[in-house]
């Protein structure tokens, strides 16, 4: 079993039922994605539209591609014909540009509205008051080719579990306020998808695999002698 397959197997074993795992494949070559695909994984996230398009063209067509990075309006055209879900929609301008590209492609594009819940000002996302104002407007109501699947947010970059939970509780509160306006799901996102303790367990698991492989190779060398 490859290292990638081992990691996927471990992470899946830690997830509750009904959770969809998006493997972040940005900056990784097509060969690494193919290894994950051969291990049974089908959902991948990319952050650069042109790179995403190239990988879509080179890899199997049953892959479900997610656009997870910041998306510029002039780059939507590269991914609109095939992308499954656009994360990080953080402005009215971007949402309405996605609507225009979706109409050109003749397909419905699914999106997540990104809400700023972290302590860092560098994090992107809607201010909740501004988003609540926008979802009550006619332009938001007139996006027939855009389906708002839910909200997402990136928690504060910290090992403090209390702070992370606070951020996601705030995101859940925002989601509940938006439900009457057609927002369907609550989606947690960010680097806390695997919490610190699970990362440590994964590292220990992979180190044990490497140790067993080394022992096996050593025994094989002795047998040959």
Would you name each region that the model predicts?
Residues 1-177, 181, 189:
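Conserved alpha/beta-domain cores
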């Amino acid at each position: 079993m490859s290292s990638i397959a081992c990691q996927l197997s471990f992470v899946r074993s830690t997830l509750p039922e009904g959770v969809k795992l998006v493997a972040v494949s940005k900056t990784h070559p097509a060969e690494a994605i193919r290894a994950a695909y051969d291990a049974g994984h089908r959902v991948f996230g990319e952050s650069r539209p042109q790179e995403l398009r190239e990988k879509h063209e080179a890899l199997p067509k049953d892959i479900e591609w997610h656009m997870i990075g910041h998306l510029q309006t002039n780059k939507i055209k590269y991914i609109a014909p095939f992308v499954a879900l656009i994360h990080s929609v953080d402005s009215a301008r971007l949402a309405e540009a996605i609507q225009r590209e979706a109409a050109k492609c003749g397909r419905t594009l699914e999106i997540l509205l990104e809400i700023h819940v972290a302590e860092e000002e560098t994090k992107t996302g809607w201010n909740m008051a501004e988003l609540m104002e926008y979802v009550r407007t006619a332009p938001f109501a007139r996006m027939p080719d855009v389906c708002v699947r839910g909200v997402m947010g990136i928690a504060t970059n910290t090992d403090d579990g209390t702070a992370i939970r606070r951020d996601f509780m705030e995101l859940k509160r925002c989601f509940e306020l938006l439900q009457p306006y057609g927002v369907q799901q609550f989606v947690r996102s960010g680097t806390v998808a695997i919490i610190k303790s699970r990362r440590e367990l994964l590292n220990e698991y992979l180190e044990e695999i490497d140790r067993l492989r080394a022992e096996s190779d050593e025994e094989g060398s002795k047998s040959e002698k």
